[in-house]
Amino acid sequence: MDYKKTLNLPDTSFPMRGDLAKREPGWVQQWEENRVYQAIRAASKGRPLFILHDGPPYANGDIHIGHAVNKILKDIIVKSRSMAGYDAPYVPGWDCHGMPIEIQVEKKFGKNLPVTEVHAKARAYALEQLDRQRQDFKRLGVLGDWDNPYLTMNFSNEADEIRVLARILEKGYVFRGLKPVNWCFDCGSALAEAEVEYADRVDPAIDVAFPFTDKAALAGAFGLDSVDDGAIVIWTTTPWTIPSNQALNVHPEIEYALVRVSPTPVHGPLVLIAKERVEACLKTWGLEGEIIATAPGQALDGLRFAHPLARAAEGYDRTSPIYLGDYVTLDTGTGVVHSAPAYGIEDFVSCKNHGLADADILSPVMGDGKYIATLPLFGGLSIWDANPKIVEALKLAGSLMHVQKLSHSYMHCWRHKSPVIYRATSQWFAGMDVTPEGGGQTLRESALAGIEATTFYPAWGRARLQAMIANRPDWTLSRQRQWGVPMAFFVHKETGALHPRTVELLEEVAKRVEKSGIEAWQSLDPRELLGDEADSYEKNRDTLDVWFDSGSTHATVLGGKDHALHGSHGEQLAWPADLYLEGSDQHRGWFHSSLLTGCMLYGQPPYKGLLTHGFVVDGQGRKMSKSVGNVIAPQKVSDSLGAEILRLWVASTDYSGELSISDEILKRVVEGYRRIRNTLRFLLANVADFDGVNQAVPYGDLLEIDRYALVMTAQMQAEVQAHYQSYDFHPAVSRLQTFCSEDLGAFYLDILKDRLYTNAPGSHARRSAQTALLDITQTLVKLMAPILSFTAEEAWKVLADSALKHQADAARLTIFTEVYHTLPPYADADALAGRWGRLRAIRADVLRKLEDVRGEGLIGSSLQAEVDIYADGEDLALLSALGDDLRFVLIVSRATVHARAGELAIEIAPSAHKKCERCWHWRADVGQDADHPEICGRCVSNLFGAGESRAKA
């Protein structure tokens, strides 16, 4: 007789190999065809809301690995909250206006298109790009309202953004002014703080002499009767700002020195610098010198000095006053700072505080980076080309003390990677220190208070955002571009004042934009709204910063506080969002702009929590770079290993720091995935012939080890759910993997195989095991689902067609309409866990001894062994209570417990009996049944008799 055919060997349609890259697209298609996202919404109706508001990626170019990390993290959170019993809609969005798309249109169609054509082509380009990205995001297994995303260029969003502008204008935050703003010559526009990045750059660092003019006043400041000729000396890394110098700054409390130097420079024998910098500066200049007098910076206030280029050209025949400034330091330079108010924020503030009028500020640099043609010596030159010529002119004028090349960290445009300058231009701002109409906190105060009320993941994000808000300048709202939401103001042609009905007029414009898009503003004849006043006003041509676009989506998409605006998705979403989740660069980007708009509109942040993830680096910690050749594209991983592997990599990596990825790292992830899949396959295969409704054993009647397995599973589920709740995914993955490999694979399932395979198919013992296994399988598959979405859905389908075939059709459609599995509560759960925890420890000791004996060649498998255990006290009672079931726990052919005082002792010997051909146990009764001499008495009973009885295991 072929006894193998009498075993209940596991069988399942769930394949051992995932073949993920081939199978996953089929699941994506099924989810779309079955309208799974809509099914989740229907199943979740009435539950508490959880809103993760999607930070919109820019609709330009294919997604990269950073996008994949971001969307996968969001998907894990949304799915885990949904399965935890929340209604967690996910509306993806795209950022559609702005420079990069405008540049692409210019590249394709040229620079001189009419605005209407720019808009039409930009819209078409954005739609084409976001559709490519949408397909890639879907391929990652991300579920969401993909057919109805929010787009910042949707007419309703553009209209509501104009309404947001109207509200913050009405509250008094918006003003126009001349201020130095970040300016990119390639963009031809102001930049937001978030659009500036830092990179090393080499520039000439120069020490420049400003000759004495009023020597009598200078002598008085130092308590001298008179002084010789000389100069005050500054240090700068921006020679191009020297033609625009209008002041000098010293620190009021720093001690300054008059130093007689030799050999004598062109300007005379004296130099004026900070006393603490004398030694270092003289060494740099190659001069000898002695201090003849000192005075605090306070005493120098108001003294004037000649422009260093005065000898080079008449146009520089002017003087520069000293202003006191607390920001002057002694780290480098001379302790004296040159001030060009058009090109530095502190310079601007200092000069304005000392009465310099906007009209008197010298700003010879045009928007393209060239000096105006009338600037003496350097007119028409680009400032970067002018740098060496300015150095040469200073040298010829006798004003150059020293020059050297300096590599330093400098501002660059994040799009063009070209250097950025501060440039004073007339712009529209949101004032950080403006008190709103009706009183209350300033925007800065409100934002800082809002940060305190926000939960940060990880916690260090709070200090980072606080520092940025505390120190940031006013927000430059305006941009000089075409493809953007208009700052739809009517400005008086003579006075520059806004029309007195601006708030009302903005609403009229918004209504038109709602119907026709921002194009409505371009085609609007002012007479339609202003009537006879139209001749006195002109349309403002500025557009809004794209960070205002995305930063106001909490209002334009979610609908704002108390649905103050309708919001494109306001009916299914809520304000404030529970969570914003983006990369760490968004502390200065979307987190930042959203905080400011939320506080301007409603006095609070639009989010309850902020989650930050790090950037992706290679296995050696290097940034992804095409030139280095270490770029890993998510599309390639999906097409080779499967998106599931990317999802598992994201979840198993600590996202709070840098996320390392390489072929070797992904290989390890694949191995981890296989272990989980193999566990899942074993579980599914052993409940394939089980009807979870009609064949289940009541929970109170389960064998003790099965009850313990459910207690163990409940503990694991509680831990994993807690990790999901706090967004700690890598410990969740680790716990799931440990559960599969140690709790199940190395313990429970290992013990269970004998009972599952050898007991009668419908026996109580086997059905007890299957009852527990079905609960464990459902628990595991549901806990895996937020991370391993494709695999969980595949397993759920197998379960739905077998052990769960009597479930309702809605539940069988997808696992994602489910909530986490409810396991039976056991009153004696702690006692069970304690007993079996100790049994597992003893079992581990026995397994180690068995390995030693196997190593000596005395036994093959553990079933060839017989074990004697000597114990007393609680251990004796614990082991004795198992009776004959102890051998199944230890997976040996005989296990005998003996009472003996002292430490627990284990003895192992090879069995002298024959091996049963069916169960492979070595038993004394093998051969005693004449009809079936090859098998043991237990197998005879299980096959032809009443079957064995099991109580514990």
Curated annotation (Swiss-Prot):
Chain positions recorded as Zn(2+) binding sites: C916, C919, C936, C939
One GO MF term: zinc ion binding
Catalytic EC class: ligase
Similarity comment: Belongs to the class-I aminoacyl-tRNA synthetase family. IleS type 1 subfamily.
Record-listed E.C. numbers: 6.1.1.5
Top-level lineage group: Bacteria
Annotated residues for binding of L-isoleucyl-5'-AMP: E582
Species, as recorded: Bordetella avium (strain 197N)
Gene Ontology cellular-component terms listed: cytosol
Keywords: Aminoacyl-tRNA synthetase, ATP-binding, Cytoplasm, Ligase, Metal-binding, Nucleotide-binding, Protein biosynthesis, Zinc
Protein's name in the database: Isoleucine--tRNA ligase
Function: Catalyzes the attachment of isoleucine to tRNA(Ile). As IleRS can inadvertently accommodate and process structurally similar amino acids such as valine, to avoid such errors it has two additional distinct tRNA(Ile)-dependent editing activities. One activity is designated as 'pretransfer' editing and involves the hydrolysis of activated Val-AMP. The other activity is designated 'posttransfer' editing and involves deacylation of mischarged Val-tRNA(Ile).
